[in-house]
Amino acid sequence: MSKIAKTAIISPKAEINKGVEIGEFCVIGDGVKLDDGVKLHNNVTLQGHTFIGKNTEIFPFAVLGTQPQDLKYKGEYSELIVGEDNLIREFCMINPGTEGGIKKTLIGDKNLLMAYVHVAHDCVIGSHCILANGVTLAGHIEIGDYVNIGGLTAIHQFVRIAKGCMIAGKSALGKDVPPYCTVEGNRAFIRGLNRHRMRQLLESKDIDFIYALYKRLFRPVPSLRESAKLELEEHANNPFVKEICSFILESSRGVAYKSSEYSSEEKQEE
């Protein structure tokens, strides 16, 4: 049975499933759909064609699904789709998609968006990600699974961050980040690999292979793109080569350049 505060303003066209909790002074618009077990604390605003997945919890003063902050937006149909078991903290803002993008903003499962996170139109966020306080995503950004982004980080539109990456706090990121990398700075650059996440997701032999692969990719000669092409030719059947090198070759913004501090020996430091 759902529990809905008397002061909540809910459109009769909104769809509310079983076990939903809606707190005081929430505003729920026409096209909103809340799946089982969703919990809205007080003063949450949901508008537009917004779907919230099972057991997602949204905290006070978060605003989801309002008109994209894009001057090209002319009122066309677009969506915001949020998956299951997410925590969306106070004052977060998440916009739907636009005609100029994929017409939707997508957020996967089991993510934590801390206070004051902004997710602009047409972004795609995977699952098991943590976006710390004040993270700002411009439009059309793609973030893979198991990504951590430190507080007060700003990310340029169309940037892609691959699986297992970590972005240090107060970074300004304008280029793509390949799988399992850590980046830091303004403008952010690759500092090394995310050993903590790799140990959680991969076997030791695969971690060794990936470290060796990145050492070869980041040699001064040939270029990064040429190195990626050579690796794909020589290791066509290796899934990690495919994942990492294809990501590099598909980059339109370029890859965050390698720091001189990067070393394949980092893995042995602990």
Curated annotation (Swiss-Prot):
Stored CDD domains: LbH_UDP-GlcNAc_AT
The name this protein goes by in its record: Acyl-[acyl-carrier-protein]--UDP-N-acetylglucosamine O-acyltransferase
Taxonomic superkingdom: Bacteria
UniProt xrefs under InterPro entries: Acetyltransf_C (IPR029098), Acetyltransf_C_sf (IPR037157), Hexapep (IPR001451), Lipid_A_LpxA (IPR010137), Trimer_LpxA-like_sf (IPR011004)
A Gene Ontology term for the protein's cellular component: membrane
Keyword Repeat: yes
Keyword list, A-Z: Acyltransferase, Cytoplasm, Lipid A biosynthesis, Lipid biosynthesis, Lipid metabolism, Repeat, Transferase
Catalytic activity entry: a (3R)-hydroxyacyl-[ACP] + UDP-N-acetyl-alpha-D-glucosamine = a UDP-3-O-[(3R)-3-hydroxyacyl]-N-acetyl-alpha-D-glucosamine + holo-[ACP]
Signal peptide (residue range): none
Pfam families assigned to the protein according to its UniProt record, in alphabetical order: Acetyltransf_11 (PF13720), Hexapep (PF00132)
TM region(s), chain numbering: none
Lineage: Bacteria, Pseudomonadati, Campylobacterota, Epsilonproteobacteria, Campylobacterales
One Gene Ontology term from the biological process aspect of the record: lipid A biosynthetic process
Top EC class, one word: transferase
Locations listed in the record: Cytoplasm
Matches recorded under Gene3D superfamilies: Hexapeptide repeat proteins, Udp N-acetylglucosamine O-acyltransferase, C-terminal domain
Assembly description: Homotrimer.
Family, per entry: Belongs to the transferase hexapeptide repeat family. LpxA subfamily.
Function summary: Involved in the biosynthesis of lipid A, a phosphorylated glycolipid that anchors the lipopolysaccharide to the outer membrane of the cell.
A molecular-function term among this protein's GO annotations: acyl-[acyl-carrier-protein]-UDP-N-acetylglucosamine O-acyltransferase activity
Metabolic or biological pathway: Glycolipid biosynthesis; lipid IV(A) biosynthesis; lipid IV(A) from (3R)-3-hydroxytetradecanoyl-[acyl-carrier-protein] and UDP-N-acetyl-alpha-D-glucosamine: step 1/6
Organism of this sequence: Helicobacter pylori (strain P12)
Protein EC: 2.3.1.129
Gene encoding the protein: lpxA
